Amino acid sequence: MSTDFTYTITIVDILPEAEGELLVNRVDLQVFRNGEGLESRLIGVKGEERPYALYRETAQKHAQVFVGRWYLDGVAKYEVVFLSLLALERRLSERPCLILHCAYLEYQGKAMLFSAPSGTGKTTQAGLWEQYRGSRTVNGDKALLEYDGKMWTANGWPVCGTSEVCENKKLPVGCIVMLSQA
């Protein structure tokens, strides 16, 4: 059995420097790429003074993750923080799948996905479908969409978001609804 990708996680007092050309520069994330196409990411949280981790790809199938010791007693208890460390969307881009920011509902044996920017009403819409149509929320924040050559399926994702609902369930995609505010 071969390994798809491996990580080495190290707790440090001082984060190493990121390497490569700066591609993305947000308050909570800086993404760099070196000449070999390998990424480094400084990962933070909005409102914090400094990043809490550095993700650095050292080969096509390996990354080092450095986590600041100061952060382990704080926000690091949340699963979303740990998943950010792994840059899973990089691994998924190598496969016929993608992560969709959405409320993922099960309705009549199929996945119904409500997607929109944060604060638009995905969770509210999911609650209304549960209340009036008998649907069930599988994940209130994300779904992993996968194409098998014939159809798209929605899969559970291990981050719950504010809904605190996340189940590992695979269903054929029935519809994707893009919400907007009036």
Where are the regions a protein language model picked out?
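A noncatalytic interaction/capping subdomain that flanks phosphate/NTP-handling catalytic cores
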Residues: M1-L113, S118, L128-R136, A143-A182
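Conserved glycine(s) of the Walker
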Residues: T120-K122
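Hydrophobic positions on the alpha1 helix immediately C-terminal to the Walker A/P-loop
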Residues: Q125
